[in-house]
Every structure is written in structure tokens, then in C-alpha cells.
Amino acid sequence: MFSSITFIGSSVVVVLLAGYWAQKYLPPPKPKIVGIDLGTTFSCVSVYYAGSGRVEVIPDDKGRKTVPSIVAVKSKSQRLVGYDALEYSDHDPSRVLFDAKRFIGLHFNEEAFNKEKRRYPFRMWLNQTEAVYHVANNNETNDANKELNIRPEEISATVLMHLKKMAQKHLQVRRVEKAVISVPAEFDEVRRNATIQAAALAGLEVMRLISEPTAAALAYGLHQKANVSSVIIYDLGGGTLDVSVLMIMGGMFLTRAIAGKSILN
């Protein structure tokens, strides 16, 4: 009886020691959720390592940590993203689509749309109240459809897919399937749902949409500062300016007011 108890006790000690050494010396588990800033002009993807508390912004093959939110549609089956699309704009700017974030989930009347589309080198048309990109199809497959109509969600999805592949390669995992994505505070339910739809097209499940001012406040640890109760967040992006007033209560952020300009020119 005594020997059995001794054996069991020794086994427990061995298991505990093995767990300790494994936790101390084995590499930490790979992050399963990425954070994405899907910007108007630039986007980036990052991961949080729970063991160390470290946040890493994932670079591309050339070490760049931001990706232009641009897609060049060479044909129905071939698209370029980011810096490759930016280079292609010198060749054919009418095929290089951008500013999808301005249009995603947004509805226009004809007058407002006609004023907006004049700002761009590519073609767009109004499908009822939704802005749609319009690109000639390079007919490499003799497709009867000579024109390509591309929704803003599809362009955002292409950028998200590019970021997803960057994360998979950097983390050396087969699949990244979950993400937290930041969106402007002024995005209503329709525009938020359109962003979720774009993520789904890229094969990403959105665990949460977080407002960009809240994301900035969290990044600076303002929720952990006892002497901070209110804060103004200025978000000066590549083509937009947003200002938000946040209240901090019990570690939570409450948006009290928002203002901004979606087109800086």
C-alpha cells in the first residue's frame, strides 16, 4: 500500500516537473487571433503574445509594416495588392482601385455620387444606392462579360486576404481564421456589417469590431491610468481626420462625441 502511494506521488511530481520545464523552455503557442487596422490608405496586421504581453506588427517580405489599401485589377482572375498595385498605377491607373473604406456600406443619392466619383481616376457607377467599381475585363479567357463590377467589400476583402497571408507566413501556421478589426467610430451598423462581410470573403471570422479611438486609447494603456477620466483622441490618417471624446469608467471606454472629415484635400 505504501509503495503504491509513493509511486503515485512520484508520478505527480514528474508530471508537475515536466509541465514546469515545458512551460519554461518550450516555445509559446502560436497566436490564433490577429488584429487588423483596415485603413483608408494603409493597413496593417499584428499579433499579441499572451505569455510575454508583447504586440508585434507583422512586416512583409521587405520589412514594411504597413500595406497600401490598394488593389490593381489586371483581369478577372489576376489582382495585385499593396505596393505591387501602387507600382502598377503608373501603367494603368484606371485599373487601380482604392478608398474602398470610404464607400463600404455607404449609400448615395445620384447627386452626391456624381460629385464623389469625379475625384477618382477609375470608373464607378451607382447600383441603386451603392457605389460599385467598374473595370474593363481583359478577355484572356474569352469571357462574354466585357466589364467587371466590383463592390467595395470585395476590394477590402482582397486587402484583408493579403494581410492574412502575411500573418500566416510570418507565424508559420497553415491558417489564420480569426481577427479583431478596427473601424471608425462613426461607422453605423450597416457599415460595420459590410466590414464583417468583407472579412468573411477573406476567410476571416471577426471576433470583434473595435472603434479606432478605443483601439488607440487601449494601445496607450489609458484604461490603466487612475488619474485619467476623459480623453480626446485625434486620428489623423492618410486621407481622413477623426476626433473623438472618450470617458473612461471602470476600465471601459464610452464614446461621448465624435467629429471628423472623411476627405482631406
Give each language-model segment a name.
Residues 119:
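Conserved thiamine diphosphate
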Residues 130:
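Short, solvent-exposed beta-strand/turn patches at coil↔beta or beta↔helix junctions
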Residues 2-115, 123-126, 141-145, 149, ...:
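Oxyanion-binding/catalytic loops of NTP- or PPi-dependent enzymes
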Residues 136-138:
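Short loop/turn segments at strand-loop or loop-helix junctions that form parts
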